[in-house]
Amino acid sequence: MSDRCELLVIGGGLIGSAIAWGAARKGARVTLLDEGDIAYRASRANFGLVWLQGKGLGHPDYMHWSIRAGQLWPELSTILLKETGIDIGWRGGGGLHFCLSESEMAARRALIARSSAEGAAIRIQLLDRDALHEIVPDIGPEVRGASLSDLDGEANPLLTLNALQLAFQQNGGRLVVQFAARNIRSEPARGFVVSDANGDEISGRRVVLAAGLGNNELARQVGLKLGLTPERGQIVVTDRIAPFLRYPSNAIRQTREGTVLLGSSHEDAGFSTGTDVETIARLCRIGTRVFPALRAARLIRAWGALRIMSPDGLPIYEEAPEMPGAYVVTCHSGVTLASLHALELGPALAEGHLGPAPRSMRSTRFAL
């Protein structure tokens, strides 16, 4: 495994696969290292939302970065379908944030006003109960209204990951599976050399660390301290029922196959990906308050997965000052930002720079 490539991407999840495909489409020789099924794969339990309303408030660079990603999602879906024949389940047209009290309505009203004041290029309207009932007639009596944005949407995260990796290989990329990167070093003649626990090595002129929570240790080896921590999210899924919800929402999403996802939680549970009855019951209570008919649905599965959280919750995009050519990319919005990672960041990294990634998203903003 000594073939040298131009760009070596560590991490075969949504972030790494999107970057690798984008770089390969640019013409770079790219190798993607995938740890395999032992990885804490966030896409396995992702809610599948492309969610922009309210994102980045108080952080203008992140807000504009996220909105740009939302604008690029139709293009990403179209290209992947053309290159792979895989329909990733993209559905745009807006998303709903349901409100179950007048105080929640007031909070959404304030969010919309703040979003407008900060210059967000997204249209968010607040629907009262009557207006909401016209487009979602099955809402329960406790629902007071909802905010509806124009950029929010949804996609199937597993199909998106599959399509990205297939398209990557069709564009000449090399996918190496069951390679759990453990060590990184720089050599004058070989560039960056990455080895696994077995001593196997792969080298590349440049390297991108997109290994999720594994980035903590890998980044340390290139001189960066990230302070990433896991945050567990649990999701519940029902059996297939007749279509009733054509918009994705903050707590409830009906897939095109008919199943309903209820979620998700935000928990400090270490590296546990388990579930608990209390959280599952809370998610079900919220779902049935919004749509009482869900009380008749049969629950078939619940699961947990880990989000990758930086100290302030925002992404990190950085080139290691001590080891130029080594880049770190990490975020907890792998679905939302996949379009931007694939269509703009990946091509930039193929050329040896971070392109449009905001400088304010370097790890130097933390006092670690």
Curated annotation (Swiss-Prot):
Gene: ooxB
A Pfam family annotated for this UniProt entry: DAO
Assigned keywords, A-Z: Oxidoreductase, Plasmid
GO cellular component: cytoplasm
Subunit structure as annotated in this protein's UniProt entry: Heterodimer of a subunit A and a subunit B.
Lineage: Bacteria, Pseudomonadati, Pseudomonadota, Alphaproteobacteria, Hyphomicrobiales
Enzyme class per UniProt: oxidoreductase
Taxonomic source organism: Rhizobium meliloti (strain 1021) (Ensifer meliloti)
Entry protein name: Opine oxidase subunit B
EC number: 1.-.-.-
